[in-house]
Design a protein with these regions (language model features):
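Active-site mouth loops of central-metabolism enzymes
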Residues: 1, 56-71, 93-98
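Short, acidic/polar
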Residues: 1-10, 64-81, 123-131
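Acidic (Asp/Glu)-rich catalytic clusters
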Residues: 12, 34-45, 78-82, 111, ...
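Conserved, mostly hydrophobic/aromatic
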Residues: 3, 10, 18, 33, ...
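Beta/alpha (TIM)-barrel catalytic core signal, keyed to glycine-rich beta->alpha loops juxtaposed to Asp/Glu
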Residues: 94-192
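Generic structural signal for well-ordered alpha-helices
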Residues: 7, 30, 34, 74-78, ...
């Protein structure tokens, strides 16, 4: 397929990082990545995420950081990706808030079990990072970060630097806005 060919082309060009999530295409993205890397596993680091779930035919998206859900999600992601260990496994969103510690504890168990190498989080604020850090070290934080979204610079980046937490920014081109492909008129129409 064109998607697999694109992944191969990226790997051939030296890209060595693929960041996906179970929720992207209801698992389809992980399956495509799995097919694309089946003969090239040593060439790439794989990151995927948990915490967004769907069930049944409706495919309505739910949120769960319950221990059982996180364990089930990693097993399904490993199967879809066709690998035995995920390089970076991240909690996608800190929701529901009251399940953050339970979910992070489950992720720590997955590190101990050898199903994931490193554990990270996405979209967590400072207070949430401080709540989970004592449970298990946070390897990385994936916040939105671009020239237009710089709020992480005030508290989050210094905290991460101090605690040796890597930053894996998402949306650095602000969903395409900073690519130069948006005219002044098009931007004005977005806010209208």
């Amino acid at each position: 397929s064109a998607s697999i060919a694109s992944v191969h082309q990226a790997l051939d060009a030296g890209v060595n990082w693929i960041d996906t999530a179970a929720i992207y295409g209801h698992g389809h993205a992980e399956r495509v990545v799995g097919k694309a890397i089946q003969d090239r596993r040593d060439d790439v680091l794989i990151a995927t995420k948990c915490g967004r779930v769907w069930e049944g035919e409706s495919r309505e998206i739910g949120k769960s950081l319950r221990r059982e859900s996180v364990h089930r999600e990693v097993d399904v992601s490993l199967q879809r990706l066709g690998i035995d260990c995920i390089d970076l496994y991240q909690i996608h969103w800190p929701e529901p808030d009251e399940e953050i510690e339970e979910g992070w504890g489950a992720v720590a168990e997955l590190v101990e079990a050898g199903k994931i190498r490193y554990a990270g989080v996405s979209n967590f604020n400072m207070e949430q990072l401080k709540r989970i850090q004592p449970i298990h070290p946070v390897t990385s934080l994936q916040p939105p970060y671009s020239m237009l979204r710089r709020e992480v610079e005030e508290e989050i980046l210094p905290y991460c630097r101090e605690n040796q937490i890597g930053i894996v920014a998402y949306s650095p081109m602000q969903a395409g806005l900073l690519t130069g492909r948006f005219s002044k008129e098009r931007v004005q129409n977005l806010t209208a």
